Amino acid sequence: MKTWIDFDAAPVFAIPLTDAVGAVTVCEGMLIEGPQGWGEFSPPASCDDRQAGRWLTAAIEVGTVGWPDPLRGRVPVAVTIPTVSPDRARQMVTDACCRTAAVQVGEGPLAADLARLEAVRDALGPDAAIRCDANGYWDVDTAVTAIAALDRAAGGLEFVEQPCRTLEEIATVRRRVDVPIAVDQSLRDAADPRGLALAEFADLAVLTVGALGGVRRSMRVAETCGIPCLVAAEAESSIGLSGGLALAGVLADVGFASTLGGARLLSGDVVSTGRSLLTRDGYLPVAPMPPAPDPVLVQRFSATPERVAWWRERLNAAQEYL
């Protein structure tokens, strides 16, 4: 697989976000061209080399063996609302035209989270769905208190994702609250996510294609984890987001929108405007392969020489785990 791809030719891009997502202010990564098409290598900075190896496996999957045929031509998508002001949250919901919002919580004061949720509910209306992602910020007692308050502020939550860091803490929270609980980071951190049974810990699993090593490996996780699965993404361009859509398109429909609306958080993209994965009426299309990068846009959003060197080292380390 390594010999089919010229990794040295992979361009490095850096697209500023319109709004920070936690500590992330820039969408950075490499575009990997395989014999059949392009993939994206954009592991978060927190990933170790082994985890980055999974992201690289995912990046070269579509350009070498391709993705499985989808069951659906489009999937419902949730708009991501980071830690922003209530007015900004309301605007983001209105612009996205989605029927589900995934609201980041736990990073700041609970009062700010509550105000943001109330604004999101006001913008969405009473019949739309709201979920929260706490990114493991809470301990058990804080999670229990916060979830009850957030559920009231939202007028009902669809679920809360990753309230605490460990599965044991999450299981304890789940027993003490009435809101369904989802896990994602626990899957990413596992040495072998395909062998992780989750039914005793959570109600839902959130799968990220890059973190799990590609669409096919993610499908195997969905088959073995024992609970319903939906799909999410990190800060990725439309090329990377296409992998999440490919997975969502082959999984059984469990009635939850996938958190794949991240292109709206980008100040630009590496694909042409018509190919950028911006939600329309709450849905995104499932395609057999990602859109090809636009050379002009790749040049416009090219990373600095220092970041290019960093990503080259990152890629070399990840290749050891292919």
What are the language-model segments listed below?
Residues 1-131, 135-153, 272-322:
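N-terminal capping/lid subdomain adjacent to the active-site entrance of alpha/beta enzymes
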Residues 15, 80, 184, 232, ...:
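Conserved beta-strand termini and adjacent loop/short-helix elements that scaffold enzyme active sites
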Residues 17-19, 188, 236:
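Residue-level detector of flexible, active-site-proximal loop/helix-junction positions
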Residues 59, 192-297:
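Shared catalytic-loop signature of beta/alpha-barrel
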Residues 96-99, 124-126, 148-157, 174-182, ...:
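Glycine-enriched alpha-helix->loop->beta-strand junction motifs that scaffold or abut catalytic
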